[in-house]
Amino acid sequence: MQRRSRGINTGLILLLSQIFHVGINNIPPVTLATLALNIWFFLNPQKPLYSSCLSVEKCYQQRDWQRLLLSPLHHADDWHLYFNTASVLWKGINLERRLGSRWFAYVITTFSVLTGVVYLLLQFAVAEFMDEPDFKRSCAVGFSGVLFALKVLNNHYCPGGFVNILGFPVPNRFACWVELVAIHLFSPGTSFAGHQAGILVGLMYTQGPLKKIMEACAGLGGFSSSVGYPGQQYYFNSSGSSGYQDYYPHGRPDHYEEAPRNYDTYTAGLSEEEQLERALQASLWDRGHTRNSPPPYGFHLSPEEEMRRQRLHRFDSQ
């Protein structure tokens, strides 16, 4: 497994263009740092892909535990990087403003490691159950497992409703599982176990004990999940409206300020589908002009996020 050599990193250029369209000042700090870290490791890989990818054989049997830290931050090529980090961009904007920067950093770090651990457990279990040792040698890189975990969180905080996947309405609570199958039907080169591990980690946080365990550990470190931006508390009610409330610990009057919902600022006026269409068009153009074409690492960006954005914007405008 070697990173493909390409004359022009079209995916990276497209990613940087999208970041600058959003505006660096509009991206929360932990989200921005996550983007920068993924880009930095792509441009300056610490090890070759084969030495940083995650597998049962290399990580568990040969005790190369550093792969748990390296594998989420390495990507096979610029398109693999683009699809993952473009998804990090909008998920980070939504979740970091809801959870607070310190807690979001804690979530990202925990999910990055735990997704790898669950991936190893899944691969080991399948290899033993099917008596097929090749599963122990299957090696994976990329941030998409963490993205699936974040998608579970996002659906948890915005419950109800349906999303359109391949033309079929799917309840929000099942969307991740349907996307998991759809991605691997159309992009068989992606890691099914890695994405499934992300979903399971997300469910461990929203439905299981993970959040309480993290809160208990965070209490020892002096911060909790209620921490937000200084001087502000995020509010969200069942009708779908949200915003920020100034918080004064000494009893000054509270008032609400609606959080800006102009998502055109974040997407340069393009929906998720339009961004994906442009990316795929650029990918096809690039494929026709280079000898080495990108592998099917395209992360499926479903239209659910754009539908949710429009719904929230409609509530805010009432």
Swiss-Prot record:
Residues 1-21, 128-137, 205-318 are cytoplasmic. It catalyses: Cleaves type-1 transmembrane domains using a catalytic dyad composed of serine and histidine that are contributed by different transmembrane domains. GO terms for molecular function: endopeptidase activity; serine-type endopeptidase activity. It is found in: Endoplasmic reticulum membrane; Mitochondrion membrane. It holds the Pfam family Rhomboid. Its EC number is 3.4.21.105. InterPro entries: Peptidase_S54_rhomboid_dom, Rhomboid-like_sf. Residues 43-106, 155-179 are extracellular. Inhibited by aprotinin. Residues 302-318 have a biased composition (Basic and acidic residues). One of its GO terms (cellular component) is endoplasmic reticulum membrane. Keywords: Apoptosis, Differentiation, Endoplasmic reticulum, Hydrolase, Membrane, Mitochondrion, Protease, Serine protease, Spermatogenesis, Transmembrane, Transmembrane helix. Residues 285-318 are annotated as: Disordered. The chain crosses the membrane at residues 22-42, 107-127, 138-154, 180-204. Signal peptide: none annotated. Belongs to the peptidase S54 family. Intramembrane-cleaving serine protease that cleaves single transmembrane or multi-pass membrane proteins in the hydrophobic plane of the membrane, luminal loops and juxtamembrane regions. Involved in regulated intramembrane proteolysis and the subsequent release of functional polypeptides from their membrane anchors. Functional component of endoplasmic reticulum-associated degradation (ERAD) for misfolded membrane proteins. Required for the degradation process of some specific misfolded endoplasmic reticulum (ER) luminal proteins. Interacts with BIK and STEAP3. Interacts (via C-terminal domain) with VCP. Interacts with ubiquitin and ubiquitinated proteins. This is Rhomboid-related protein 4. The lineage of its organism: Eukaryota, Metazoa, Chordata, Craniata, Vertebrata.
